[in-house]
């Protein structure tokens, strides 16, 4: 049996590592990424435009690209359809973009075809597979759905890691929507997402809608949300939100008003009803104020110099708020 390799924490901390590399800065990392969206939402337009710009080292949404050759397996299209798309895109057709409309499947010739292409075109650093489903094969009866999806992506990840390249898989979404987590809409098992290095999910509220929301996440990619608009066959960036931006939007306006309320006094104590009345808030807020204060105690109140605690008496539960510009979130305790 092959011995397990380990490294102790002290050695690991001292060892220098090369930072993660990106083909498109902050967008497409080395490894396997998923681009998922509903059918006919413009995914193929997006990846063809990206491929043409990456070949020429042109920026994508203001992000720096690393120029390289690209292999685009457009397995649901024809060469004539691809030609028509390129005519309609504003960029020149680069010679470094190699197009293919028929290829083998995983464990049935695809790996060897990629190896052959890489030998002939070693400057290739991006392979786009459109769509992922077209290269998948059935697994044996002993392989579960999760394991099968994980294995398929892992096979491609090994190729990406061996060559130090990026592979972008175009994939579909389930018809059933999940507004709480758009990544749950990715077609197939969670094993597909679990094995990927990054994932992008395009969501449209209505098919006729001209914009899409793109949700991004990854191992070396911080969560972001983009709003894109298709204009003259090109997806343009309208809005970009980081995780911090999204978190800030979740802060209820009531808390900002509370900060102003406490600027006029060093401390305050009383019931939720009394707080709402003194602040002039809507009466319905009294049913939510305790939950809001508890949820945002460490993430908002303490960074704004407000210490919060509660005390239960025989008559009622009292809320205690005190200004303390030196307060540390590690010291914040709620007395119940």
Pin down the residues of each PLM region.
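Hydrophobic positions on the alpha1 helix immediately C-terminal to the Walker A/P-loop
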Residues: 46, 50
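Post-Walker A helix-loop "phosphate-sensing" segment adjacent to the P-loop in P-loop NTPases
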Residues: 53-67
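DNA transaction DNA-binding modules
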Residues: 228-336
């Amino acid at each position: 049996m092959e011995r397990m390799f380990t490294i102790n924490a002290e050695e690991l901390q001292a060892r220098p590592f090369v930072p993660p590399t990106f083909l498109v800065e902050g967008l497409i990392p080395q490894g396997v990424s998923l681009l998922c969206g509903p059918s006919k939402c413009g995914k193929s337009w997006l990846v063809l435009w990206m491929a043409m710009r990456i070949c020429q080292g042109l920026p994508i949404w203001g992000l720096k690209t690393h120029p390289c050759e690209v292999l685009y397996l457009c397995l649901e299209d024809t060469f004539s359809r691809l030609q028509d798309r390129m005519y309609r895109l504003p960029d020149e057709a680069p010679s470094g973009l190699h197009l293919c409309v028929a290829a083998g499947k995983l464990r049935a010739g695809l790996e060897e075809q990629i190896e052959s292409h890489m030998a002939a075109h070693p400057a290739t650093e991006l392979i786009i597979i459109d769509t992922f489903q077209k290269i998948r094969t059935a697994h044996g009866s002993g392989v579960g759905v999760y394991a099968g999806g994980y294995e398929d992506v892992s096979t491609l990840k090994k190729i990406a890691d061996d060559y130090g390249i990026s592979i972008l898989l175009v994939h579909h979404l389930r018809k059933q929507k999940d507004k709480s987590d758009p990544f749950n809409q990715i077609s197939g098992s969670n094993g597909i997402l679990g094995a990927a290095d990054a994932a992008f999910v395009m969501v449209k509220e209505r098919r006729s809608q001209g914009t899409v929301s793109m949700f991004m996440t990854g191992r070396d990619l911080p969560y972001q949300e983009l709003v894109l608009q298709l204009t003259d066959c090109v997806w343009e960036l309208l809005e970009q939100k980081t995780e911090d931006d999204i978190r800030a939007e979740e802060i209820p306006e009531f808390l900002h008003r509370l900060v102003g309320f406490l600027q006029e006094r060093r401390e305050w104590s009383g019931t939720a009803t009394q707080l709402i009345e003194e602040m002039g808030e809507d009466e319905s807020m009294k049913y939510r104020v305790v939950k809001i204060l508890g949820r945002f105690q460490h993430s908002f109140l303490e960074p704004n110099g407000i210490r919060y605690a509660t005390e239960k008496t025989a008559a009622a539960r009292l809320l205690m708020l005190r200004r303390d510009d030196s307060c540390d979130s590690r010291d914040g305790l709620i007395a119940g």
